[in-house]
Amino acid sequence: AHLRHVCDEEGIQQSEWGGRMHYLRWKTPTSLYGWEQAGMTYDSTLSYADHAGFRCGTCHEYPAFDPAASTCFNLRIRPLVAMEGTVIGKDYMGLGLTPSALEKFLQLKQACRNVEGKFTLLWHPPRFENQQECEMYEAIVKA
């Protein structure tokens, strides 16, 4: 509710509100309750850190489930398909800023298009300080 109040004061209007939580901070079902109470409409936490792809087996949203009440939340899960650090980072797939990395992102994006799903991409803000990474991000978004 506080987020929406501040956004209203700033003139920010949008129909969807979502977020992503670092996996080390995630706690089921407490985190889901928090998002629900905050009025979020979707969560994009679920992904693999070490491999880009379909951790949830889908690129379509689905309702978050409350295991304590055996019911669905209003909150939707929007699976995170790719994170820049996973694909280009040395600690994970290690493709760097190469044509192979761009190809991997574009393959995943096309796989989502093929089934009319959503390609959810996480690109951390510090990565925009590097011109090559900005160019790769732009190529992915424009594709």
Annotate each predicted stretch with a short phrase:
Residues 6-11, 99-143:
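C-terminal domain-boundary segment and adjacent tail
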Residues 5-112:
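Active-site-adjacent pocket scaffolds in enzyme catalytic domains
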